């Protein structure tokens, strides 16, 4: 099945890319207040869709959307492995720590993307052959933009509060 992305932000029945970026980045910031992690999350927020790009045609053409690149299990395994490696087993040097935080954020961004797609349709479940998710709203619907707006407002409020109490990490 061929899916075409309506440039520059939507992809078939998935959430629009701009909203993936806003929601994922806001959640990452609200959870961590860690800039390298947040930058990684921003980059990872559209990665599952980008990995499906058909290389021979264009970066806007996709085959079999929401299949293997939207399976959350590999991302979760890598995220948990890196988190245990980095925080419990072997704390990294300053440079390695920066790379680690960006990578961990990127994996978080991929996981968030998949969770966000699960509210506008289905994604692979525990196996590639099972599907989970429910379409609570359609792509581009006012509800999608309302969720993004709420994330922006919460992030601004958090920035104001933490800006007074302590600097960002």
Language model segments and positions:
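N-terminal membrane-targeting hydrophobic helices
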Residues: 1-169
């Amino acid at each position: 099945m061929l899916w075409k992305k309506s440039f520059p932000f939507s992809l078939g029945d998935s959430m629009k890319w701009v909203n993936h970026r806003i929601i994922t980045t806001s959640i990452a910031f609200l959870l961590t207040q860690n800039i390298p992690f947040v930058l990684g999350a921003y980059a990872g927020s559209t990665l599952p869709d980008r990995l499906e790009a058909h290389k021979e045609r264009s970066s806007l053409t996709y085959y079999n959307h929401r299949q293997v690149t939207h399976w959350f299990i590999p991302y979760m395994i890598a995220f948990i492995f890196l988190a245990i490696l980095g925080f419990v087993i072997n704390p990294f040097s300053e440079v390695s720590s920066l790379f680690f935080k960006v990578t961990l954020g990127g994996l978080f961004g991929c996981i968030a993307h998949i969770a966000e797609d699960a509210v506008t349709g289905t994604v692979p479940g525990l196996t590639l052959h099972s599907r989970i998710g429910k379409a609570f709203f359609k792509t581009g619907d006012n509800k999608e933009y309302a969720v993004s707006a709420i994330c922006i407002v919460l992030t601004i409020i958090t920035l104001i509060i933490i800006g007074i109490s302590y600097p960002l990490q």
